[in-house]
Regions:
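Noncatalytic scaffold domains of N-terminal-nucleophile
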Residues: 1-124, 128-130, 134-169
């Protein structure tokens, strides 16, 4: 988790529970690093090749499925209630451009998502933790009251761990 946050600091904010949105529950994102490590350990393709189909869908668009549309509507309502576009600017720019929710069958496109996936692939996730993407994440966190800083991202490394196991039914 970011160095600037601790259980004590959350308690100082008089939180009875960690909220489900905003910066307080955010930890250093591990997924891009995990992708890179998994591809290195188990893959036959580069991370760039693995991510390209997703980047292409983000760039060219795809029709919004009904179940995804329902989740976006729920998110829209929740984020409006919790502070709206002022607090969740990135979410609204991505999923409700111009304040308009997409409907079932509408084509969703997101060039920024495509560009980000390609940058992650091209740098084997390094940009996300120690490059331009990391700088953008850290700057946005600081600007909007988040706890995450560049050194939190720079220090992150995904690791393979032995999973916890138990004997079930003998």
């Amino acid at each position: 988790s970011p160095r600037l946050i601790s259980g004590e600091k959350l308690l100082e904010k008089v939180l009875k529970a960690v909220p489900s949105d905003g910066w307080d529950p955010v930890m250093v994102p591990g997924t891009p690093s995990a992708w890179a490590e998994a591809v290195k350990k188990f893959g036959n393709l580069s991370l760039s090749e693995v991510l390209e189909p997703a980047a292409k869908y983000a760039e060219e668009g795809y029709p919004l499925a009904p179940n995804i549309g329902k989740q976006w509507v729920l998110g829209y309502k929740r984020f409006m209630k919790a502070g709206g576009p002022e607090k969740f600017e990135g979410w609204f720019e991505t999923f409700a451009p111009d304040g308009k929710m997409l409907s079932d069958g509408d084509v969703f496109r997101c060039q920024a998502m495509a560009d980000t996936l390609r940058e992650i692939g091209a740098t084997n996730a390094e940009s996300f933790y120690r490059g331009e993407l990391a700088k953008k994440i850290a700057a946005y966190s600081e600007k909007t009251g988040g706890w995450m800083r560049l050194d939190d991202l720079e220090d992150y490394r995904a690791e393979f761990v032995e999973p916890i196991t138990t004997n079930y039914h003998g």
